[in-house]
Amino acid sequence: DVLDTWFSSGLWPFATLGWPNKNKYLNKFYPTSVLVTGFDIIFFWVARMIMFGMEFMNKEPFKDIYVHALVRDEKGQKMSKSKGNIIDPLELIEKYSADALRFTLLSMASPGRDVKLSEDRVKGYRNFLNKLWNANNFLKVNKCDFNKTSKTPKILININKWIYGELIETKNIVEKNIKDYRFDEAARNVYQFVWHSYCDWYVELSKTILYSKDQKAIKEVREVSSYIFKQILILLHPFIPFVTEEIWLKNKLDNSKKIFLMLTNWPKGKSKRDKNFKEVKKMINMI
């Protein structure tokens, strides 16, 4: 009999852990939680791992299977040297950054669809990174002290209530989409919040207070704007880890002795909705 090269690879989930001998690694790591793979090897590899797992271990090797998209050119064609349509990821990283390429691929990773990659899309997400960097500079220029905002600040001003409510709403939907493996939706959710709600609306509306003489209002806006921005960095970190970590370290955001952003807890909090919140949101939607 002749077996193809994929046959023995079906044993991989447990053969790599010392099987057929029983040991602590096999007990700890089998079964695992999720397998990430492409649709082109579902039959050749994934199906056989499940069949062998059930046969020899009496358990399926993983709970979830995440089938990721394949990357094609902007017209949906398979990349090949003969067609001359290959996009070198290293060149894109050198030109636009690893985070820009990473965010592009995540935002386009819709279930059941291949990624039609173009340089213009990567360039667009590079602009998003610039937007985030400029927002950080705006806060620093306006004397927003990040290290005084580890706890949710007291919120009285309407625009602050609005942006805090938007933050919690975004956090909840991003969290749900990540758990559901909808990374494209999660990326778009946080993108919309940062670019439109925070940068386009909140920052611009807050300028009228920051440039006023109302010291009490100025203090609240400084605290809320920096608090929200810190939560933004945490929300964005799974998508764009390099620039968010860089901003975090530059601002020395080391609350609770957690020097690195990657060690920080996921944002928590409940939305403080009231009549004024709804009125501000309605006004913004109308404009």
Residue ranges with predicted function:
Residues 73, 106, 145-172, 204-287:
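Acidic, turn-prone loop/beta-hairpin segments
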Residues 1-144, 163-206, 210-211, 223-236:
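Structured secondary-structure scaffolds
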